[in-house]
């Protein structure tokens, strides 16, 4: 304390000495700490850290309340700097992982590591196992028994999920005589087990977020085990395992798709557990929809019986181009500025004013050339199409098509340029530009497009070149690669991802008639699936695909279209 006497005053002023004066270094205690959580319930686990200051005179003092505390992985927990417990870290119970704890004062910094490990068992409250203690560590394990071991069938090995997915329904085949199951999620920092009496378990809410937050930095290994409560001596049968990861970047919230449940366009997304009908409010059938790149307009085919005609609406649900004006439509695409709408109908391309519906002419393709499935490039310079010379396509089917792009410049169309050649045994269709315009995703099949079980996803540079098969996305089920005839079609790129630390992946929705675990154990019903793409990869850029949680698995769902703008239709 310093005493100062002021001239002409009778009061003595006391000045408090700076407690950090002459501090030369900082230390954190304890160092390299670990928190192990065996119960995810409250109260939350805490760990008290101390900040120690070293001073020029050789002394060391506790300065915990005088420094700024931070942790570089806020998913693990936080320091309450506004409270009274300085240096007290409270675990979130919402993630396992590693972090760096830092303190700072007077330009000096100290760091230490913190590891949060989750080692817990959860009993399924909805379908509990028939008895307790069926998976005790002392019970013998048998791996790979062809009759008794269960088989994890969803998700597939190597699935990359977005961090905002609402839920994941893990599904497995039971194995003979088994009535109790244990699904284990394992990594360096996570040892989570769920015991259930069912052949499926849904991770949602807090547990879905826990898996996502933990797997962002390292893959999680998932394994299913099974036993029979009525058979002695007890044995635990171990099935296959899969690895899964979660990306840092997420696709937009909104995904529109057609559903046979309503014969209309549904509004959903990866963050939604269910979807609602967007349009129309009547029972009329609409489909083959597309959204303008700015999300302000939605075009679709409207069933006018016997014709299907163009109908467009704005984001508020107001009609722009009414179906009553009878402009035949199969597929459509907006110009990047949203001012023009190119419509394909039975192989003929016609351009319209998107705001008035006025005709702007027919695209000259040349003699015996037909085009369908148009998609306008983000820069407006080209329209990609499925181009055929064999026979005019219908709006439902195209044969022997090539992937081509048609130049466009201020109202003038150029000659179609072939990017991927087609033939009667090599059909290429549904080209779709990536958000940056560098790539085209498209579909390849060995025959006609309608109902093509051989349909698979492909990728090619937008200017042409060697095409890549999206082999994993198109042909992986569970642990098995190159599964044929999964009917993967209708690719749709998500707009630029929402990202936490920088965009790393592109997201591609598509339709596939593949099995979905034990819910849809056989192929044949089209559903919406999504794959993550690493566009920097020199090989197959795709990850194993995941099922869109908001759709109705009992009906056909197709034609996914992403949007960053919500349509409000009353």
PLM regions and their residue ranges:
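Compositionally biased, low-complexity repeat tracts
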Residues: 4, 27, 49, 54, ...
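Extracytoplasmic soluble-region selector
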Residues: 10-127, 131-132, 177-180, 203, ...
């Amino acid at each position: 304390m310093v005493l100062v006497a002021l001239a002409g005053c009778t009061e003595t002023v006391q000045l408090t000495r700076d407690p950090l004066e002459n501090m030369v270094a900082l230390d954190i205690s304890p160092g390299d700490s670990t928190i192990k959580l065996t119960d995810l319930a409250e109260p939350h686990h805490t760990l008290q850290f101390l900040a120690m200051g070293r001073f020029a005179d050789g002394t060391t003092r506790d300065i915990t309340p005088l420094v700024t505390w931070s942790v570089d992985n806020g998913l693990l927990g936080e320091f309450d700097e506004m409270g009274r417990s300085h240096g007290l870290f409270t675990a979130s119970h919402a993630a396992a992982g590693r972090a760096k704890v830092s303190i700072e004062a007077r330009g000096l910094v100290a760091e230490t590591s913190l590891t949060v490990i989750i080692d817990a068992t959860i009993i399924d409250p909805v379908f509990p196992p028939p008895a307790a203690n069926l998976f005790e560590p002392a019970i013998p394990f048998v791996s790979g028994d062809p009759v008794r071991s269960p088989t994890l069938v969803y998700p597939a090995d190597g699935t990359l999920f977005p961090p905002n997915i609402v839920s994941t329904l893990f599904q497995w085949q039971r194995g003979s005589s088994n009535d109790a199951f244990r699904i284990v999620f394992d990594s360096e920092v996570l040892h989570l087990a769920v015991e259930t009496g069912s052949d499926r378990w849904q991770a949602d809410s807090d547990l879905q977020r826990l898996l996502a937050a933990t797997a962002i930095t390292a893959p999680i290994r998932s394994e299913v085990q099974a036993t029979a409560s009525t058979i002695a001596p007890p044995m635990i049968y171990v099935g296959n395992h899969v690895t899964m990861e979660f990306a840092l970047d997420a696709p937009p919230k909104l995904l529109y798709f057609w559903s046979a449940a309503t014969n209309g366009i549904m509004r959903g997304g990866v963050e939604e557990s269910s979807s609602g009908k967007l349009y129309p409010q009547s029972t009329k059938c609409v489909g083959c929809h597309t959204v303008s790149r700015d999300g302000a307009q939605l075009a679709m085919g409207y069933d006018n019986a016997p014709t299907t005609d163009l109908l467009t609406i704005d984001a508020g649900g107001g009609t722009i181009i009414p179906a009553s004006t009878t402009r035949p439509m199969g597929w459509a695409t907006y110009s990047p500025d949203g001012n023009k709408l190119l419509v394909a109908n039975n192989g003929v391309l016609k351009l319209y004013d998107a705001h008035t519906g006025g005709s702007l002419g027919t695209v000259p393709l040349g003699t015996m050339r037909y085009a369908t499935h148009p998609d306008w490039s983000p820069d407006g310079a080209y329209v990609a199409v499925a181009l055929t010379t064999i026979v005019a396509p219908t709006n439902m089917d195209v044969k022997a098509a090539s992937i081509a792009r048609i130049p466009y410049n201020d109202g003038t169309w150029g000659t179609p340029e072939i990017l991927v050649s087609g033939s009667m045994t090599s059909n290429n269709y549904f080209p779709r530009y990536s958000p940056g315009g560098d790539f085209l995703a498209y579909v390849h099949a060995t025959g006609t497009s309608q109902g093509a079980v051989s349909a698979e996803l492909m990728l090619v540079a937008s200017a042409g070149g060697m095409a890549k098969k999206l082999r994993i996305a198109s042909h992986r089920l569970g642990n098995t690669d190159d599964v044929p005839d999964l009917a993967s079609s209708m690719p749709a790129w998500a707009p630029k991802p929402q990202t936490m630390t920088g965009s790393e992946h592109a997201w591609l929705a598509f339709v596939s008639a593949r099995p979905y675990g034990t819910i849809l154990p056989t192929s044949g019903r089209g559903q919406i699936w999504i794959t993550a793409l690493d566009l920097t990869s020199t090989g197959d850029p795709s990850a194993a695909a995941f099922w869109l949680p908001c759709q109705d698995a009992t009906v056909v769902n197709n034609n996914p279209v992403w949007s960053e703008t919500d349509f409000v239709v009353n």
